[in-house]
Each structure stands twice: as C-alpha cells, then as structure tokens.
Amino acid sequence: MHTPVSIYLKVRDMYPQSALMESSDYHAGENSLSFIALCPLASIGVNGGIVTANYPDNSRTEEPLTKTFNVEKAMNRFINQFQVTGDNKNVCGLYGYSTFNAVKYFEHIPVKESHDEQNDAPDLLYILYKYVIVFNHFKNELTLVEMLSEGEESGLPELEAAIENRNYASYNFSVTGPVTSPITDEEHKANVRKGIAHCMRGDVFQIVLSRRFIQPYAGDDFKVYRALRSINPSPYLFYFDFGGYRIFGSSPETHCKIENGRAYIDPIAGTTRRTGDTVKDRELTEALLADPKENAEHVMLVDLARNDLSRNCHDVRVVFYKEPQYYSHVIHLVSRVSGMLNEGADKIKTFIDTFPAGTLSGAPKVRAMQLISEIEPHNRGAYGGCIGFIGLNGELNQAITIRTFVSRNNELWFQAGGGIVARSQDEYELQEVNNKLGALKKAIDLAVKLKN
C-alpha cells in the first residue's frame, strides 16, 4: 500500500528539493488530501529587499522592492506568467513559506539581522514544481500530475518507476550534543516581565514572546518528521527540502485560507497541558474555558482576526468560538473567523494584510512586533511565519509555522512562545513554552530510536 511517507522515501533522492504536505485526517471528506511536490520548475523569493525569480527556461531576474513594486505586485506578476490547462490544475501552484522576518516588507518593523554568514535562506520563497503527487485518502486514490510545456516529453514513466521501486536508501538519525538555548529560563522569565510591564503601561494589550532551542544532530532529519507526525498529528503536517535547509513540522493553526471567495483565519489562543487522563484533561479544559486571562486573550485575538479580514472582506463572522482541540501534549482553544472577499479584492493582498498572525505577534499588532524585535535576542526566522500553498488562481492555504523545526548545518532549531497580558505570571509562561515544546523534544528522542 502506498502512503505519502513511503513514496516520499522512494523519490526524495531522485528528486531533490522536494516537498511533502500531509493531512492527518484520512477519513473526512474534506481536508483528506496529501501532496508530494517534485522537481522545481520556477520560483520566486525575497531576501535583503531583492526579488529573485527563476523561470523554466533557466532565465533569472533580480529586482529591488520599491514603494511602487512591493511583494504583492511581485507575487502577482510572477503567478500571472503561468497559464495552466487540463485536469487537476487546482494543485498546480506555489509551495513554500514566508518567514516572520518578511513582515519588514509589509510594515515599518525593525527586524534583527542574522549574523550567521551561512544563513542565506530567503525571507520568503515559493516554488512551482513540475510534478505533484496527490493522495485522496477519503477515496483511496493516487493521482500523478505533471506540468508540461507544449511539445515537451513526459517524465511520468521515470516517476512511476521510482514509486514502484522497492530498493531505496535509508539513513539513521542521532543527536551529537545536548539541547541548548540562547537564553536561560531566568532570562526568558525576565523577558516575560518586560512584556507584562509594556501591557501594564498600555503600550500593548498583548504580546507574544518566544524562545529558541537548538539540537545538534547527525544523519537524516526526516526521521524526526516521521516521529513528530506519529506523536502529534495535526491539521498541517509538512516537510520541505530546500536543498541547504529543511523546514518541517506539525502545525495546528491556519494562518489564512482562501477558497471559493471566502477567507478564513483560525486563531488559537488559550493553552494548557494535556495529561492523557480523560477525566483530568476534561477538568483542565473546563478550567481553561473559565480562565479570565485566557478568555480576555482569546477575545482580543478573535477581534484582531476580524479586523485583519475586514480590510479586504465583508460579511465577516465568527464561524465557531473557543472550541477545545486536543493534541498530544497540549489542549488549545480555537475559533474560526471568515469573510467574503470584496469585489475586486486581491487574494495575495488579503493574505499579506493578515500577516503575521495576531496569535504570534500581539495586539495592537504593529506595536507588538516592534517590541518583539527589541526584547527577543534574535530574529525569528521561519518561526511565527507561514508555510503552505498559493494556487495560480490566487486561492491559498497557509499554516502558521509553529511546532516546527528548521534543519540546517546539522542543527535543529525549534521555538515556542506564549501570549503575555497584564495579568500573566512569568513562571506560568515559562511552563507554557515547555508544554508547547513537549512534542518536538519527544520527536527527537523517538527519532534516535527509529530503526531503518
């Protein structure tokens, strides 16, 4: 039986710089699709204020961003150069990410520069792939989609042979040192207290402060992804290989989804640990739902999502509110906000106007991001940005980049944070970060034990 993971293991060495996106719900009629994208045809990236576009004819353009040539225009111009006809054209689009750092192209936000000379990863990168393997788990169907120029010979026979191949390389994973963090527990608690002080002064109502961890390793980081997806199945499971670095994770949160003329944001605000004991978890859920601090934070972020969508939408409504959702190590409170796109509204602009998520920045959003840049000791990179798909028709589905690893130079970087309000307590906020990182740390431990 073919699964997304089993096929990915077979094709990844033959088709480097590939992407795997899985659904964790194989039995639902909706959201039961998984994808493997192979063989980059074209790409658009932004780094250092320069837009770089690569095309199927091997041509390349570089152009600086200006007041009149912004990311929205660059993305739309790139997308509009590709016209796709035929079946399954809805899966032909751009797969990639926007880092939290990309906000500097959308708002006047200072972002700490990276001092890592080896870190040449773009702030924003989306790729158009030649092949997309589509799994419909509900119908138990597998479809191979190929993008061909007129007169071009198909490469599907080679792909089909790779899928049926039973002899493929496998690799081990091991850790080569302890997990470290650029800041200590006490330093993170001091940062939390700074956030509380800004809330008390009225600079912000809420601010999300995070902390990074680093795990040195050797071997195959795909083992960590496999462990994570088994420990912590989430609505968004993904493994992107960009050559010199990988981004992979199991995100529970939709940043922005646009389909059939409606835009959706699913804010998560309110988190408690999960014990695995049904009775105890029910008690923890009831306490979370009744907690004044968590309720105030949730209301604030639902309102922020409504405001973000209202910039380009009408009929903005709350679809469901404070729904408890259960994951391996935590319980979250989740709402869904949706709006109908205004006539003539640009879908890319609608996406950009929601970025970054309020649940990863704070409220008011711009001031919160300015303070984050002052308080956190490093730029966030991928953490708190988004990752996913942008269709050539502008429809999109982007997850928030949380519960995520960035793998580079034999190091795994992972990060978590919490929403700080005036009544927050530093020790509780430290524990919330540890709760959120529980699944990631457990995945590393399990990956070491996984045999080929």
Residue map of PLM features:
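Extended alpha-helical targeting/anchoring segments
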Residues: 1-452
